[in-house]
Curated annotation (Swiss-Prot):
Keywords: Cyanelle, Plastid, Ribonucleoprotein, Ribosomal protein. Belongs to the bacterial ribosomal protein bL34 family. GO terms for molecular function: structural constituent of ribosome. It comes from Cyanophora paradoxa. The keyword Ribonucleoprotein applies. Its main location: plastid. The lineage of its organism: Eukaryota, Glaucocystophyceae, Cyanophoraceae, Cyanophora. This is Large ribosomal subunit protein bL34c. Pfam families: Ribosomal_L34.
Length: 46
C-alpha cells in the first residue's frame, strides 16, 4: 500500500494556528476577538 497524500504534523498545526501563536500576533488577537464576539465554544482548534 502507498502512503496517504496528506499526513499532517500536530506540532506544525499547533505552531501555526494554536492559541499561543494566535495571541502573540496582532492579527491573531483580532481572530480570537472575533471568535469570542461570535460566541464560539472553541476559540482555536488546537
Amino acid at each position: 500500500m502507498s502512503k496517504r497524500t496528506l499526513e499532517g504534523s500536530h506540532r506544525k498545526k499547533v505552531r501555526k494556528s494554536g492559541f499561543l501563536s494566535r495571541s502573540q500576533s496582532p492579527t491573531g488577537r483580532r481572530i480570537l476577538k472575533a471568535r469570542r464576539k461570535k460566541g464560539r465554544k472553541m476559540l482555536v482548534k488546537y
